[in-house]
Amino acid sequence: MNWRSERIWVEFITGSRKISNFCWAFILFLGSSGFLLVGISSYLGKNFISLFPPQQILFFPQGLVMSFYGIAGLFISAYLWCAISWNVGSGYDRFDRKEGIVCIFRWGFPGKNRRIFFRYLIKDIQSIRIELKEGIYTRRVLYLEIRGQGAIPLTRTDENLTPREMEQKAAELAYFLRVPIEVF
């Protein structure tokens, strides 16, 4: 969802709360729980999973390795669930022509850098830069080129905008900010 008026443009950025992250976290949790359960059942010699008897899987080395994979998968799943609950990467880009300020805000992981906030003057914006790399790993990213600061990405690398959508977004933003467009 974006909001735009004559002098202010606010673009909201989705973070970790995407359907794909929910799916991966859920699948990883189920799979790693299964691996850990098989490892524990082979260690104890009891049948916790009715698909096969525990005597078919020896604890050393198969049960031990499956337990390790299960524990590692649970840690990765917990990391994904934490990133989803904290909504890491979400935020907004606010372009305010009235005040002459660009504000970029993102949520990070808890700690010192939980709130990531950048503020620049519009007069310091050199250009809007489009980076297009086609091939097996396509990459289409929109950057805000700031004098003395370098380039700041405005779109995520996994956003998958078509070249036409990318050009349209860059043209609208460049027109709004009254800066040129560069293509790399």
UniProtKB/Swiss-Prot annotation:
Keywords of the record, alphabetical order, are: Chloroplast, Membrane, Photosynthesis, Plastid, Thylakoid, Transmembrane, Transmembrane helix
User: Membrane-spanning residues where?
Assistant: 21-43, 63-85
- Please tell me one Gene Ontology term that the record gives under cellular component: chloroplast thylakoid membrane
Could you tell me the membrane topology recorded for this protein?
Multi-pass membrane protein
Q: Which InterPro entries match?
A: PSI_Ycf4_assembly
Q: Which ranges form a coiled coil?
A: none
| Listed Pfam families | Ycf4
| Cellular compartment(s) | Plastid, Chloroplast thylakoid membrane
Protein family per UniProt: Belongs to the Ycf4 family.
State the name under which the record lists this protein: Photosystem I assembly protein Ycf4
- Name of the coding gene: ycf4
